[in-house]
Structures are given as structure tokens and as C-alpha cells.
A protein has these predicted regions:
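Acidic donor-binding segment of Leloir-type glycosyltransferases
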Residues: 12-33
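Structured catalytic cores of enzymes that bind and process phosphorylated ligands/cofactors
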Residues: 5, 37, 92-93, 161
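Phosphate- and divalent-cation-binding pockets in alpha/beta enzyme and binding domains
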Residues: 22-23, 114, 158
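Conserved donor nucleotide-binding strand/loop of the catalytic core
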Residues: 31-42
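Conserved alpha/beta core of the MobA/IspD/sugar-nucleotide pyrophosphorylase nucleotidyltransferase superfamily
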Residues: 119-165
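Single conserved hydrophobic/aromatic residue that forms the stacking wall/gate
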Residues: 1-11
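Conserved beta-loop-beta/alpha segment of the NTase-like Rossmann-fold superfamily
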Residues: 41-115
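Short, structured coil segments at secondary-structure junctions
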Residues: 6-8, 28-31, 111, 142
Length: 165
């Protein structure tokens, strides 16, 4: 998570869930604040909730840039353009790589309460409908205002399967 608007004051927060102890032993997170998501079994939405809950008390933060941990090779041009693009307070900013939207995405504070309310809805041990939650699909399907930024290069590789390495 990167927080704040513009490139002036940027704060890094890393939300870790499953295998968080192994990750903190093997990766130097430099100047990042590490947040632990104890409810990682719920899927990505619980990590988003963890980060937003932590940030919500700081009224100086007006937006959050959410990255996926399996996409370490985000072009710095994308980050800079997302942070510097003018947008409405109720408008999500999403990069489009050629013809495919992707991460990171900029979410204004306006949406945080709505995202914090999404929880695992199944208590019988079955997978929640949010287990494979996709943030971009959520905003598209809820007809939220979105500003799309076009980039003329391919979406960064997801390193989420053994075959990706």
C-alpha cells in the first residue's frame, strides 16, 4: 500500500497474511510498516480491510495505492502517473495495459468504508464469495466512477503459480 496524494509524502505499508513470518525473515521491506492480516483465510479482501483499518485514523491520507504482492515489476511510470493524475474524490484510478486493466489501483478515502464492510459471509467453512475477490471487478460491477490511465505496454507478470518462475 502506498498512501497519500502526490509524490510528496508517500508512506509504504505492507500487509502480510499466510506465511508472514517466513516473508519477514527472507525479505527486506526497507522503510515499510508491516501489518499482519490474521484473517488471511478470507482472501484478499481481508488484507485490504486490514490496511484500510490501520490507515483510517490518519485524516491526512486521502487515498491508497493498492499493489498485488505477486507483481513486483510495476513500472515506475505507472506509479507516478497514478499518483499525479487529477481525479474526483469519488473516482478510482486504474491503469490499463494495452487492453487489460490491472494493478496497482488508486482508491480514494471515499470508498474505504464500503470496502471495510465486506466480510467473509459463510461461517460453515465453505469458501466465501469474496475468497477470490477482485478489486477492479468490484468497482466495475458496482458502477463506481473510474478513471482509466492507458499505458502502451503489457500488464506486469503475475508470479502466482510455480510455472511463472
Amino acid at each position: 500500500l502506498l498512501t497519500s496524494r502526490g509524490l510528496g509524502d508517500v508512506y509504504k505499508r505492507q500487509v502480510l497474511g499466510h506465511e508472514n513470518e517466513t516473508l519477514t525473515e527472507k525479505i527486506d521491506f526497507k522503510n515499510s510498516t508491516i501489518l499482519i492480516n490474521e484473517s488471511w483465510e478470507e482472501g484478499i479482501i481481508s488484507s485490504i480491510r486490514t490496511g484500510l483499518f490501520y490507515l483510517s485514523s490518519d485524516k491526512n491520507i486521502d487515498g491508497v495505492l493498492i499493489f498485488m504482492g505477486d507483481q513486483p515489476a510495476i513500472n515506475s511510470e505507472v506509479i507516478e502517473k497514478l499518483l499525479l493524475t487529477k481525479h474526483d474524490d469519488d473516482e478510482v484510478v486504474v491503469p490499463q495495459y494495452r487492453y487489460e486493466t490491472g494493478y496497482p489501483i488508486l482508491i480514494p478515502r471515499y470508498f474505504w468504508n464500503k470496502l471495510e464492510l465486506i466480510t467473509q459471509d459463510d461461517i460453515d467453512g465453505d469458501d466465501s464469495v469474496f475468497k477470490n475477490f477482485d478489486l477492479i471487478d468490484f468497482f466495475e460491477s458496482s458502477e463506481s466512477k473510474m478513471k482509466i490511465l492507458n499505458f502502451n505496454f503489457l500488464k506486469p507478470t503475475d508470479f502466482d503459480k510455480q510455472s511463472d518462475f
